[in-house]
Amino acid sequence: MAEVIIELKSVERHYVQGPRKLTILNGADFSLKRGEMVALVAPSGTGKSTLLHTAGLLERPDAGDVILAGRACGRLSDDERTAIRRNDVGFVYQFHHLLPEFSALENIMMPQLIKGLPRKEAAERAAQLLDYMQIGKRASHRPSELSGGEQQRVAIARAVANAPLVLLADEPTGNLDPVTASYVFEALGALVKQSGLAALIATHNHELASRMDRRVTLADGKVVPL
């Protein structure tokens, strides 16, 4: 049986708007196993981003806990959560957020350098990832010189540069045409399987969702299977 990498246990997340308290996550339970790619398919406004941010330790649960690699993270200090997030969690968004003044290679090197990896090793790792994503020849190009699909491939490579345990993606193909989206999805899926990541992918694309290991949605603040 595959190892459980991340688990949400009875997670609650509330926001206060004026006199009202909005409950976004209400006792949410969810887990991801190593090498598993799960689609999160839910309408806008139901809490997809909140779920991703809570799972990725960007937001702290109001109740319940997030267990990452066997470690309870919900009540850790901000510094401890930041360190775990940098080491163990990768994020990909609909818009790539690549640094425009740096090349594709340098963008992928950046998180490794921040972690303290020597520049030569970071460059070698970045080049390997670009080759794996089939855009090695574009290593010296800046984001503005890349197509939308190429930009997202660089963003995915950057997200996994530090070999995280978990990849969380919020509409990673939402800004791409269907053909390009399919190519990017295939590259992402191959990377997940090859590296043994656990991946949660929020998407409105039902065709891509059907190609993942399983699908879940959000209903009344809970994670339920589709």
Swiss-Prot record:
One annotated Gene Ontology cellular component of this protein: plasma membrane
E.C. numbers: 7.6.2.-
UniProt-annotated location(s): Cell inner membrane
PROSITE patterns: ABC_TRANSPORTER_1 (PS00211), ABC_TRANSPORTER_2 (PS50893), LOLD (PS51244)
Keyword Translocase on entry: yes
Sections of the chain in a coiled coil: none
Record's bilayer topology term: Peripheral membrane protein
A Gene Ontology molecular function term of the record: transmembrane transporter activity
GO terms classed as biological process: lipoprotein localization to outer membrane; protein localization to outer membrane
Keywords from the named record: ATP-binding, Cell inner membrane, Cell membrane, Membrane, Nucleotide-binding, Translocase, Transport
Record CDD domains: ABC_MJ0796_LolCDE_FtsE
Domain of life per record: Bacteria
SUPFAM superfamilies, per database record: P-loop containing nucleoside triphosphate hydrolases
Segments forming domain ABC transporter: 6-226
Enzyme class: translocase
A Pfam family of this chain: ABC_tran
Residues reported to bind ATP: 42-49
Record-linked InterPro entries: AAA+_ATPase, ABC_transporter-like_ATP-bd, ABC_transporter-like_CS, ABC_transpr_LolD-like, MacB-like_ATP-bd, P-loop_NTPase
Disulfide bridge partners, by residue number: none
Function: Part of the ABC transporter complex LolCDE involved in the translocation of mature outer membrane-directed lipoproteins, from the inner membrane to the periplasmic chaperone, LolA. Responsible for the formation of the LolA-lipoprotein complex in an ATP-dependent manner.
Subunit structure: The complex is composed of two ATP-binding proteins (LolD) and two transmembrane proteins (LolC and LolE).
The family this protein is said to belong to: Belongs to the ABC transporter superfamily. Lipoprotein translocase (TC 3.A.1.125) family.
Protein name: Lipoprotein-releasing system ATP-binding protein LolD
Species this chain originates from: Mesorhizobium japonicum (strain LMG 29417 / CECT 9101 / MAFF 303099)
Organism classification: Bacteria, Pseudomonadati, Pseudomonadota, Alphaproteobacteria, Hyphomicrobiales
